[in-house]
């Protein structure tokens, strides 16, 4: 999903999708970077249900000065570097998507 008003994109992957399409560990490596190739997208997120634990794995990437690390720390119990960060969410994938969408609107407010 693309959020043009926030120059952002979101990719999600559920356990069911991983089972249905026979995903193996490592198959999603680099997936979070793909939306950054789209014109106007400077921030990308990948939310994936963990295959072993009841949590959501969060990968964040950006271009330019968008602070992935601050976004990860504030909303997803994570951290990292300016343009590459990660975290986790203890809840459902749908809840994590809602948090992400609300965070996009809130994060860049003055």
What are these regions (language model features)?
Residues 1-75, 80-110:
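Hydrophobic helix-and-loop "lid/oligomerization" segment in the mid-to-C-terminal part
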